[in-house]
A protein has these predicted regions:
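C-terminal motif of bacterial Sec signal peptides marking the signal peptidase cleavage site
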Residues: 20-24
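Exported/periplasmic ABC-transporter solute-binding proteins
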Residues: 25-65, 69-71, 76, 80-84, ...
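Bacterial N-terminal signal peptides that target proteins for export
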Residues: 2-13
Length: 261
């Protein structure tokens, strides 16, 4: 269990208790879900959320005594796991379109769907790399031979990278240089380990990684609106709603902002 924070989180605890009261009032039948003050919550989350959700989880655990277990991966792969019956309580995707897909299949609690953040992408290279760039068009230069992006077929940040390269008019020239990561964290690791010179990754990971990075203009790709929802099969709806509420609370928003959201 992550260590308990001080009483400065009392307002959050009050919020959680209020949500518990609302849930109890809605359903007079005997409750089978775990209350937000105890138990365990399993959250599937896109890889770009790793650092920020780990901090959110620590804060939430300390305030509620609900242990949060995270499963991080590419949004597409996590979506397929949910479709195949993975026992997640809440899913935070890197693009709300995947939440819409699950809603169409009747796999989420409809009123729990929400957009919680908008993502950005960056060019990232290691500090010791001799590569220098000012913008995405520089990736077409011959001295840059290997570029990593997340697989656009199942990773929203990879799709945004592909769209940006196409909009910049360099897709055809850089496509032979591309190395695809299964998710955005693996994509960053390719650049960190020197397997590629440059990676296109999320702003969140760039901020929290020791390297040089440049923002890619938002107008080069479709918005990365990140959505979440509670799974219809959850046995812990009360805690899942409390965690979702914490993400959008003033405290949660401050943490999200610190990580580039």
């Amino acid at each position: 269990m992550i260590s308990r924070l001080e009483t400065r989180l009392a307002p959050l605890a009050a919020l959680v208790l209020a949500l518990a009261c609302v849930t109890a009032c809605k359903d007079k039948s005997p409750a089978t879900t775990t209350t937000p003050s105890h138990g365990e919550l399993t959250v599937a989350a896109a890889s770009d959320l790793t650092p920020v959700f780990e901090e959110l989880g620590r804060e939430f655990e300390s305030a509620t005594q609900t242990k949060v277990v995270f499963v991080f991966g590419s949004t597409g792969m996590l979506t397929r796991q949910i479709e195949n019956g993975a026992p997640f309580d809440l899913f935070a995707a890197a693009n709300v379109s995947y939440i819409d897909q699950l809603e169409q299949k009747g796999l989420i609690i409809p009123d729990s769907k929400a957009v919680y953040a908008r993502g950005r992408i960056t060019l990232w290279t290691a500090n010791e790399s001799p590569v220098r760039f000012q913008g995405i068009a520089d990736l077409a230069r011959p001295e840059i031979q290997r570029i990593a992006i997340a697989n656009p077929d199942h990773a929203p940040y990879g799709l945004a990278a592909k769209q940006a390269l196409q909009s910049a008019g360099v897709w055809d020239r850089v496509q032979p240089k591309l190395v695809y990561g299964d998710n955005i964290r693996q994509t960053l690791q390719y650049a960190q380990t020197g397997n590629v010179e440059v990676a296109i990754v999320s702003l969140t990971l760039s901020i929290n990684s020791n390297g040089r990075w440049t923002l890619i203009p938002e107008e080069l790709h479709q918005p990365i609106d990140q959505g979440l929802a509670i799974m219809k099969t959850t046995g812990n709806e009360q805690a899942a709603r409390a965690f979702a509420a914490f993400i959008s609370s003033p405290k949660g928003k401050a943490i999200m902002k610190k990580y580039g959201f």
